[in-house]
């Protein structure tokens, strides 16, 4: 009994301990489970937060991509608008011409001539404003300048070499700004074409059907200087509507104007049995005015008034007046005027121009020139240098008391129907063949042939009267208005027994060559 009681007590105590231990273990487990559940909940919440962040980032990225797309589209649209506006505001164009010439003169070989290439730009900064430019490359292929400076042989050596092609010229034919106040009143300033006659303001090669410019405007010229002739200045132009009477067109400018300017020529010559020669020729002749500091105080004026009763019909008069002597010579002026016109009757056209230029008091200018220059020439005498001669010479050129002349050109436009289906017609809307005849005459009265002076005194002034005429006949093919293929025969004649070289600036005639025959084949194009 006692043992049973003892066993019962022991079991009771053990069971109590086990129960206590089991109770403690369940509490721990419950607490651990709660902790785990809490961690799981926190992880869920963290995942939800991360998912939300990811969704927000994806939304932000999508919004950013959309914004980038919108900005790119906006930039493309802006670029398109700028390109479109630029294309509307700025137009690049130009014209060029090439000629082949066969000539009867002894010293002129058959030759191709790159007449010129002219680059044009026409811009509109705003609706009523315009900027226009023509940059000419005449007979130009290259221009290279080399210069070295270094110590040598106990001193300083400077060497310069210039390489270029004969007759090359780079020139601004036009560069002006225009403000259209009204159709009848437009302000223009810059390098403007002088409106004397019709050719100078319509000189583009691809407008004409003969591959040579006229004697009046270029080959002599009768104009104070050869065309194209721009001057720096300002003025007004415009169109005045006259209702049923057509319209008046005018131009009027104040410009620097023509002036006698120096052209310096270096000549190196070997001679036998005479001494070898190095010559410096300084030739003063009428030249277009400067774009820097004018050589004279007074300015020139030029104006043209044209009446056009119908399209294709025009008659005009123009005038030029201005001092042509620099400030260091006596004050003398040029007076020039021109009459020109165009008439169209069906396929026939007649276009003409007459120009008269008067250089006042050429003899007085020669005396004034002699006083300033003092001696016409100076050289090293043979007693000092028996094998080598160096000479400096001054002379007047291109002056005549009066120059006047005209050209008249008749044209007949036609197109044979059988050519329409050929390569000459099927690619073009309105191809044309044009038969052309041009007649020209020039008179030079009081042309300065020679002026000699010494010690500041004019000792000899030799002047003469000369005449020159030319007839040209040809055929032109125009597939489009901007392109022309030209073929012409040209006959030029001056006073019997006198040289054509004395009265033209393009024919290298010998002293006894008073006439020349030429075949001209040319292409002129615009774009």
Please describe what each predicted stretch is:
Residues 22-103, 391, 420-423, 453, ...:
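N-terminal periplasmic/intermembrane-space "pro-region" immediately following the signal or transit peptide
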């Amino acid at each position: 009994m006692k043992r049973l009681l003892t066993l019962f007590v022991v079991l009771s105590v053990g069971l109590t301990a086990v129960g206590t231990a089991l109770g403690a273990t369940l509490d721990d487990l419950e607490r651990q489970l709660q902790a785990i559940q809490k961690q799981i909940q926190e992880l869920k919440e963290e995942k939800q937060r991360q998912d939300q962040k990811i969704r927000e980032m994806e939304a932000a990225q999508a919004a950013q991509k959309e914004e980038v797309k919108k900005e790119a589209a906006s930039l493309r649209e802006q670029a398109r608008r700028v390109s479109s506006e630029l294309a509307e505001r700025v137009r690049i164009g130009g014209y060029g011409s090439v000629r082949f010439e066969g000539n009867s003169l002894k010293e002129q070989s058959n030759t191709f001539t790159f007449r010129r290439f002219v680059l044009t730009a026409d811009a509109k900064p705003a609706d009523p404003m315009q900027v226009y430019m023509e940059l000419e490359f005449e007979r130009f292929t290259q221009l290279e300048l080399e210069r070295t400076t270094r110590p040598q042989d106990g001193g300083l050596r400077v060497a310069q070499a210039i390489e270029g092609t004969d007759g090359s010229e780079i020139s601004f034919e036009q560069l002006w700004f225009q403000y259209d106040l009204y159709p009848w009143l437009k302000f223009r300033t810059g390098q403007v074409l002088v409106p004397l006659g019709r050719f100078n303001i319509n000189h583009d090669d691809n407008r004409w059907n003969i591959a040579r410019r006229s004697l009046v405007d270029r080959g002599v010229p009768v104009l104070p200087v050869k065309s194209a002739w721009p001057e720096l200045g300002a003025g007004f132009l415009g169109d005045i509507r006259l209702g049923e009477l057509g319209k008046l067109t005018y131009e009027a400018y104040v410009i620097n104007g023509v002036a006698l300017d120096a052209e310096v020529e270096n000549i190196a010559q070997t001679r036998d049995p005479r001494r070898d020669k190095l010559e410096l020729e300084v030739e003063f002749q009428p030249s277009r005015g400067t774009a820097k500091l004018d050589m004279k105080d007074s300015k020139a004026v030029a104006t043209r008034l044209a009446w056009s009763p119908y399209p294709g019909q025009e008659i005009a008069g123009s005038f030029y007046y201005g001092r042509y002597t620099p400030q260091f010579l006596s004050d003398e002026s040029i007076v020039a005027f021109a009459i020109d016109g165009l008439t169209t009757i069906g396929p026939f056209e007649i276009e003409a121009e007459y120009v008269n230029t008067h250089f006042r008091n050429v003899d007085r200018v020669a005396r004034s020139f002699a006083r300033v220059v003092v001696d016409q020439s100076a050289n090293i005498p043979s007693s000092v240098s028996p094998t080598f001669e160096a000479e400096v010479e001054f002379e007047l050129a291109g002056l005549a008391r009066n120059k006047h002349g005209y050209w008249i050109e008749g044209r007949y436009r036609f197109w044979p129907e059988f050519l329409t289906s050929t390569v000459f017609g099927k690619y073009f809307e309105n191809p044309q063949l044009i038969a052309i005849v041009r007649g020209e005459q020039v008179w030079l009265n009081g042309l300065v042939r020679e002026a000699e002076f010494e010690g500041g005194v004019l000792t000899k002034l030799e002047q003469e009267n000369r005449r020159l005429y030319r007839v040209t006949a040809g055929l032109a093919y125009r597939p489009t208005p901007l392109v022309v293929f030209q073929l012409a025969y040209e006959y030029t004649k001056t006073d019997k027994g006198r040289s054509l070289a004395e009265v033209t600036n393009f024919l290298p005639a010998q002293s006894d060559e008073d006439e020349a025959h030429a075949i001209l084949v040319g292409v002129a194009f615009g774009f």
